[in-house]
Every structure is written in C-alpha cells, then in structure tokens.
Design a protein with these regions (language model features):
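Structural signature of hydrophobic alpha-helical transmembrane segments
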Residues: 20-32, 109-118
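Membrane-interfacial loop-to-transmembrane alpha-helix junctions, especially the N-terminal start
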Residues: 3-8, 48, 138-143
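Membrane-interfacial loop-to-helix junctions in multi-pass transporters
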Residues: 2, 78-79, 114
C-alpha cells in the first residue's frame, strides 16, 4: 500500500542519514521518528495523504516547491495537512540536495531556515482551514494567503541573513506566484480532489 511504501522509503532515507556523518546523524533519527509518527497518525488515512506528503520531491526537482504546501492545504483537512507539511519539511531538509529545495532552507541551525519552516507549515494549515468549506472564493483566498505567507517568510529570512531589508528571491517569487495562480484555477474549476472529512 502507498503509506507503507512511503514509510519504507522514508525509513531508508533516515537510516542512510544516521549512518552518514554529514550532515548529522541526529537528522537521520528525526527523519525516522517523523516517518513513523506520520504513518501512525496520518499516513494510514489514504492515498491522498501520501501523495500530498511526498509531492515535494518531484515538485522541488522541477523548481515548483511552493506548490507542495498549497496542494496539501487544498486536498486535506487541517490536521492531516499539518502532518503532510511536516513530512514535506523533513524531506526538504534531508533530501533537498537531490530535489532542489535545499536552497529554500539552507542550514538547519540558521534562524532563516526555521522562519521558512514556520511559514511553510502556517501556509499549509491556513489554506486547509480556508478550503474546508470547499467554496471557490475561499479556495482562491486560501491560495493567495498561502502564497503571501511563503513570500513574506523568505523575505524575513533573507532580511535576517543579510542584515538589511530584503524581499524574496526572484525565482522564489515567480514560482510562488505561478503556484498561486495554478491553485486559483483549480479553485475556480471546483476540483473534487479533496478529502476534507476528518
């Protein structure tokens, strides 16, 4: 089943990190714990949870990582969207060098990284909350709010990193806006690919 296949993949990822001194074994332990907790709490809910959690890897590979939290927020109820967002973050921190999103986070010990993580999770949950009623207007509003949070989070992170006021990078801004537009179109079309029942 997809959830157990996802668990196996994430466990292998965690073990490989634990056995590798770089970046750090503790990250492997975190990855293993997060994978087990996610499957126990959320992953068994259905295929949608698995897809929303793991979609970050292919999207990051093609440069559209900002679409991942919006997809999770659109398709899942808040509690399950939170679980998917956490797994997305863990995957970005652990396999980012293979999928691209490491440029969004950088070092796990830096403040900008944690600002981005918080923004990512808040954007996902807020979009999910707004999309619960499954109306076109709230779906569009959810996508816009999620995009703004992602843009602001990176802007704040870059400001702290550089020491002077800065906005999000051009690439991040473009991909986030495109992701927002895509989700607005999905919202207008009223796609039924949702699993909002808790």
């Amino acid at each position: 089943k997809p959830p157990f296949g996802a668990l196996l993949a994430m466990l292998i990822n965690g073990v490989s990190l634990f056995l590798c001194p770089v970046p750090m074994p503790v990250l492997g332990v975190v990855a293993i714990a997060a994978a087990i907790a996610w499957v126990v709490l959320f992953g068994r809910e259905g295929v949608a949870d698995t897809n929303c959690a793991l979609v970050i890897s292919p999207l990051g590979l093609v440069g559209f990582a900002p679409l991942a939290p919006m997809i999770a927020g659109y398709c899942l109820p808040p509690r399950r969207a939170l679980g998917a967002a956490i797994i997305q973050v863990v995957l970005m921190l652990t396999v980012g060098k293979n999928t691209g999103p490491e440029l969004l986070f950088g070092s796990i010990t830096s403040i900008p990284t944690w600002i981005m993580i918080c923004g990512w999770i808040i954007a996902t949950v807020l979009m999910s909350v707004l999309c619960v009623r499954e109306t076109r207007i709230l779906s569009i509003l959810g996508a816009i709010c999620a995009a703004l949070i992602l843009l602001i989070a990176q802007g704040i992170g870059l400001t702290i990193l550089t020491g002077f006021p800065a906005g999000p990078s051009g690439t991040w801004a473009i991909t986030t806006v495109l992701a927002c537009v895509a989700m607005c179109v999905v919202g207008v079309l009223g796609s039924s690919v949702r699993h909002k029942g808790e």
